[in-house]
Amino acid sequence: MSTVLSERRRFLKEILLHKAREMLARAAELLYAEGAEEVLAFASVLKPEGFDEHSDVDIAVKTLTEEKKLSVERKLEDIFVDIAFDVVFLEDEIRSEIRERIQREGMTWKR
């Protein structure tokens, strides 16, 4: 019985991760269209075993104007309708441990 439940849970996690990555691809498309120089994903969305219903999608963005940042955040909310997300803009002041984590494990999301 527990094998059936664990398999079901694993299957649902895979579906959720796939959905999150599809949303990430749409978000990256939007960000590049708005002028981002680079879009990076980091943290649990890159780790299939670590992504679950409590996870969010972490995105780092390089080079967007201040006015674009605000409008982009609103548009991202429309993309990530039922999955939480965090976006950081690399030209802003961010905590050093977050910046180091992005540099260490961030993956450029292609256009």
Regions found by a protein language model. Give the residues of each.
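Short hydrophobic/aromatic beta-strand micro-patches
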Residues: 60-62
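Catalytic core of pol beta-like nucleotidyltransferases
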Residues: 1-40, 46-53, 64-111
